[in-house]
Amino acid sequence: MQLYSSESESDDSQYWVDWFLGLKGNEFFCEVDEDFIQDRFNLTGLSHEVPHYSQSLDLILDVLDPDLPEEVQDEVEASARHLYGLIHARYILTAQGLYKMLEKYKKCDFGHCPRVLCNGQPMLPVGLSDIAHTKSVKLYCPRCEDVYTPKSQRHASIDGAYFGTSFPHMLFQVYPELAVPKSQERYIPRIFGFKVHSYSATFKKQDVYKEKQKKRLQGAEAESKNKLAIT
């Protein structure tokens, strides 16, 4: 039995992960190494979050008992998709996972920033929460440092927890050479050539806040380095 054969046009020998990644709307996901999935340490705590956990894991690994009762097949398939997403969030923080997502980033698989002044900057998927069923996935632009809703509804409906809140920032920590200069350009509303005062005041407040945040982060980084030096 193959629970996913009804939506797949390929032959019966197709692996579940290949089938899942081939579904429209799943282009943001990368392939999680089977060794990572089989290491139960990497799955710690997930059994409490996923119904039919054992059967779902077996389905992902293509070792599911073919005699699974028909009345639970749909539930197991849905749980397998959810489980893969949660595993994916952990995997893309590993060296192998970061590299695979880096390759997709280089190919602009996640799209370009819609902000005109970012000049087509490639984006990265990010979650606004690490808790499943809370927020859908967003796209993070490293140039303007803002997040956007994916254009496609297929992508916009993906759970943000499948990518997590740390992924894009971890990627640039591991690959600092990919860091892009932050956008300093800002559209300024004008009427007959004069800046609109209310917007100018807002921009000034934003700049002050941004500078305070930058100093706070620099201070925290320096403190962290001092602690490491002492130890």
UniProtKB/Swiss-Prot annotation:
One of its GO terms (cellular component) is nucleus. InterPro entries: Casein_kin_II_reg-sub_N, Casein_kinase_II_beta-like, Casein_kinase_II_reg-sub. One of its GO terms (molecular function) is protein serine/threonine kinase activator activity. Phosphorylated by alpha subunit. It comes from the Eukaryota. The keyword Nucleotide-binding does not apply. Transmembrane segments: none annotated. SUPFAM superfamilies: Casein kinase II beta subunit. Keywords: Phosphoprotein. The keyword NAD does not apply. One of its GO terms (biological process) is protein phosphorylation. PANTHER family: CASEIN KINASE II SUBUNIT BETA. Tetramer composed of two alpha chains, one beta chain and one beta' chain. Regulatory subunit of casein kinase II/CK2. As part of the kinase complex regulates the basal catalytic activity of the alpha subunit a constitutively active serine/threonine-protein kinase that phosphorylates a large number of substrates containing acidic residues C-terminal to the phosphorylated serine or threonine. Belongs to the casein kinase 2 subunit beta family. This is Casein kinase II subunit beta.
